[in-house]
Amino acid sequence: MLRVFIFFVFLGSGLAGKVKSPITCKYFISKNNTWYKYNVTILNDTIILPAYNTIPTNATGISCTCHDIDYLQKNNISIRYNTSILKTFQDIRIIRCGMKNISEIAAGFSKELKFLDLRYNDLQFIEYNILRKLIRSNTPTYLYYNNLMCGKRNCPLYYFLLKQEQTYLKLLPQFFLRRISFSNNHTYLYHFLSCGNKPGHEFLEYQTKFCRTKFPEINITVNQLIAKKNTERYKNCYPFVLVSIICSCISSLFLLICLLRTICKKYSCTKQGKTTHSYIPLIPSYTFSLKKHRHPETAVVEDHASTANSPIVYIPTTEEKKVSCSRRK
């Protein structure tokens, strides 16, 4: 008996561990303008909502949120909607978890959604044709994507963007574009899902066309959008650019100083050579001594090393001058 008791205890604890936490949903009553909560259970690892007996017939909208997203992802629990009941609502507010393809939510819908929340999904891209079926083109629509609310009540523009572009949604929350990349020529195509009541204006990057709506404050060109992106992209490089400019200025100043120094040095050396070195001796200096000779003009020159630096000077005496003059006579 003890073994049987222990067996049932372990069995009960194991079953209790598999009990799934409920998912909280709400339905909206437009008469009271109030949301009412109700719980939905998990059946065969699938959440089926809403149930026919849990939502009153006068409800005009539903909203279902993930109670524990981590729990759903770890246990591979998916959400399946009863699309037949969803068709009757005018304001459908849906939050999906773990969705990787928007076609999962688009299947079975016969009317356009007025509210769509895609924050808790791993969507790499959203197909344009499917999204156009889910949102209304002539009435304001809220669209949540990557934790950013994209939509305004006073702006009938709708968009979806690639997941990596979520940063730029903060810059232009009222301007909704789709960006498609072409791998061939690295060109980007911006597609306006709705411009006022006109569907689909397409522009290539760097073109100056723009989509003007009936709201004057929403008027922006594709070039302005690209300029905002480039500003955000290169904002972190500004300090490095400043440092490089300062270094180039310092190097230019150093080269200019060296050039001026070389020119000044050359100019000062030339001037000094003209003033102090006007006489450059080509032969060594000698001291002359006159020996007695019959012709003083042909006197022999003797070198005296002791007075080698004396100048070349020869001054005849008075007697020699007289002798020379008398001989000439």
UniProtKB/Swiss-Prot annotation:
Highly glycosylated. This is Transmembrane protein I329L. One of its GO terms (cellular component) is host cell endoplasmic reticulum membrane. Belongs to the asfivirus I329L family. Viral TLR3 homolog that probably prevents TLR3 dimerization and subsequent induction of IFN. Inhibits dsRNA-stimulated activation of NF-kB and IRF3. Residues 261-329 are cytoplasmic. It is a single-pass type I membrane protein. Keywords: Glycoprotein, Host endoplasmic reticulum, Host Golgi apparatus, Host membrane, Late protein, Membrane, Signal, Transmembrane, Transmembrane helix. It is found in: Host endoplasmic reticulum membrane; Host Golgi apparatus membrane. Contains putative leucine-rich repeats (LRR) and a C-terminus cysteine-rich capping motif similar to domain structure of host TLR3. InterPro entries: LRR_dom_sf. The chain crosses the membrane at residues 240-260. Residues 1-31 form the signal peptide. Residues 32-239 are extracellular. Induction: Expressed in the late phase of the viral replicative cycle. It comes from the Viruses. Glycans are attached at N32, N39, N44, N58, N76, N82, N101, N185, N219.
